[in-house]
């Protein structure tokens, strides 16, 4: 089996596509033959060493947190899925020819592999953020960073819930935001004022996907600081906002099921750019540069 890996922290150029040990499904897990695996910002942050806490790399490093493929091994206690089923979901070290998933759903037959691979992390993260904010029909939510992988999925999931969605992006992505159901505002300095103008005042909730706007500015948009949830600014709690990175907040199997339903009903559209695994360096460079519309996906 081959996998994307690195033997030192650094830029995307340190990545190699080479032989790796074959993983096996543990209890409550499944293994898949990977047909597509997505690239998330966390991947290049890990690659750069930003998440290492200053500790040296112990052995080869592997990347990837979501993928789609065909089930080829079931762990102990797994039910409701069989070898040969086509699935997508979340796991670890998914940028490989085989990968183990710990949360999954059956892939809708109408959805291609790349789109399914892009739905794991984005779907779970979006569902978690909207659930923590308890977004309801008729409410207004501001999503800061609406054109990227998580942001675009969150926009659509909030719209399905009946919310009015305001989302920030570069001007080049405003047309895209309108297509997926959001009122676009320009990101960057002064975004709070632009959100107020679009909303006619305060909003009911803020989902901070980008982590670029000062949290104090985001908190000023809502009546209670706890109505700001961030996945990208780990200092947001200092201003009374909530930070979520998964853990106890996460309900991944429920999230995967919701996303699968939305994909099957064409209520969720995920834009993807695909790259063969031997062009992973290029995909990582694009991800690291930012302002990606939708998701970047690697194909073995």
Stretches found by the model and what they are:
Residues 191-201:
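Short amphipathic alpha-helix with an adjacent loop that forms part of the alpha/beta core around
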Residues 119-188:
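Mid-domain Rossmann-like dinucleotide-binding core that forms the NAD(H)/NADP(H) cofactor-binding site
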Residues 11-14, 19-68:
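N-terminal glycine-rich beta->alpha transition that marks the start or flank
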Residues 68-91:
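A glycine-/small-residue-rich N-terminal strand-loop-strand element
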Residues 178, 209-269, 277, 300:
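Glycine-rich phosphate-binding loop and adjacent beta-alpha segment
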Residues 90-103:
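A structural motif shared across PLP-dependent enzymes of the aminotransferase-like
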Residues 1, 33, 256-300:
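C-terminal hydrophobic helical "lid"/dimerization subdomain
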């Amino acid at each position: 089996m081959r996998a994307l890996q690195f033997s030192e922290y650094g830029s995307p150029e340190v990545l190699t596509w080479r032989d790796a040990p074959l993983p096996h499904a543990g209890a409550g897990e499944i293994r898949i033959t990977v047909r597509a695996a997505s690239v998330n910002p966390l991947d290049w942050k890990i690659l750069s060493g930003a998440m290492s806490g200053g500790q040296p790399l112990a052995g080869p490093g592997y990347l990837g947190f979501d993928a789609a493929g065909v089930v080829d091994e079931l762990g102990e206690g797994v039910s409701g899925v069989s070898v040969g089923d086509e699935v997508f979901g979340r796991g670890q070290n998914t940028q490989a020819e085989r990968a183990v998933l710990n949360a999954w759903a059956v892939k809708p037959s109408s959805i291609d592999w790349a789109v399914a691979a892009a739905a794991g992390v984005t779907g779970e993260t979006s569902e978690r953020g909207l659930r923590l904010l308890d977004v309801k029909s008729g409410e207004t939510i501001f999503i800061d960073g609406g054109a990227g992988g998580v942001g675009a999925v969150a926009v659509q999931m909030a719209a399905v819930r009946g919310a009015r969605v305001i989302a920030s992006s570069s001007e080049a992505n405003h047309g895209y935001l309108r297509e997926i159901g959001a009122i676009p505002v320009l990101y960057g300095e002064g975004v709070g004022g632009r959100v107020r103008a679009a909303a006619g005042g305060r909003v009911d909730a803020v989902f901070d996907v980008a982590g670029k706007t000062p949290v104090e500015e985001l908190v000023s948009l809502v009546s209670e600081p706890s109505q700001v949830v961030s996945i990208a600014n780990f200092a947001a709690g200092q201003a009374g906002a909530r930070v979520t990175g998964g853990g106890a907040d996460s309900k991944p199997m429920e999230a995967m099921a919701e996303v699968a339903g939305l994909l099957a009903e064409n209520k969720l559209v995920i834009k993807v750019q695909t790259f063969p695994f031997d062009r992973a360096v290029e995909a990582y460079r694009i991800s690291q540069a930012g302002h990606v519309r939708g998701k970047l996906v690697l194909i073995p």
